[in-house]
């Protein structure tokens, strides 16, 4: 049985399935599958999530689907002026999409503020040259926000340390392969929220 994740980019598609499984599988009776669909960018992903989720949940063979998860970066959309905090933006956006899909097998979650935030949990996974210029006063990973979101921070550090840009589909994939999921969950409450949601859905199916 498997989860279907609808994401917005190549980083998610190429990198996060094994990372998420490494946290979930030890807590389940049987290992689960995770299939990630890349919708090529935030705007397209958000526009497509409702129809994609419904199609997956209604397709033949859907009894093998534990649930469909929408996963988009919180960094990207424009928010109404009264939504000023991360919690407000997360909650309002989550509720909006889940109401539209209207299926208990669907959950909407957001990476706060990008999936690269999870990588910031452990500077030891980065090249030594990047570690040597690591910001001493770096905030908790999910507080690295709109001013310089995680991917832009990493791009700046990589350029300064190596003279090369940070490539999401190359460096990101390599780094996620090194990252301990328990370390990331301990440092990222919204990641923990998503994984605990997935764990509860899997256990409800007897896994």
Predicted features and spans:
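C-terminal accessory helical subdomains adjacent to catalytic cores in phosphodiester-
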Residues: 2, 13-40, 47-207
């Amino acid at each position: 049985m498997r989860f279907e994740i609808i994401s917005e980019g190549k980083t998610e598609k190429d990198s996060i399935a094994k990372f998420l499984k490494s946290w979930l599988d030890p807590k389940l009776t049987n290992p689960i599958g995770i299939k990630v669909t890349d919708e090529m960018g935030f705007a397209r992903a958000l526009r497509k999530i409702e129809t994609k989720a419904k199609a997956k949940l209604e397709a033949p063979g859907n009894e093998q689907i534990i649930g469909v998860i929408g996963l988009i970066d919180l960094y990207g959309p424009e928010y109404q002026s009264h939504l000023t905090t991360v919690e407000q933006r997360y909650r309002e956006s989550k509720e909006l999409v889940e109401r539209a899909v209207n299926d208990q097998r669907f959950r909407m979650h957001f990476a706060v503020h990008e999936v690269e935030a999870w990588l910031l949990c452990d500077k030891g996974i980065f090249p030594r040259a990047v570690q040597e210029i690591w910001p001493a006063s770096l905030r908790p990973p999910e507080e690295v926000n709109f001013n310089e979101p995680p991917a832009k921070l990493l791009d700046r550090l990589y350029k300064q340390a190596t003279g090369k840009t940070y490539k999401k589909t190359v460096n990101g994939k390599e780094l996620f392969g090194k990252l301990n999921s328990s370390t990331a969950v301990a440092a990222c409450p919204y990641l923990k929220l998503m994984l605990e949601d997935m764990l509860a859905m899997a256990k409800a199916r007897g896994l």
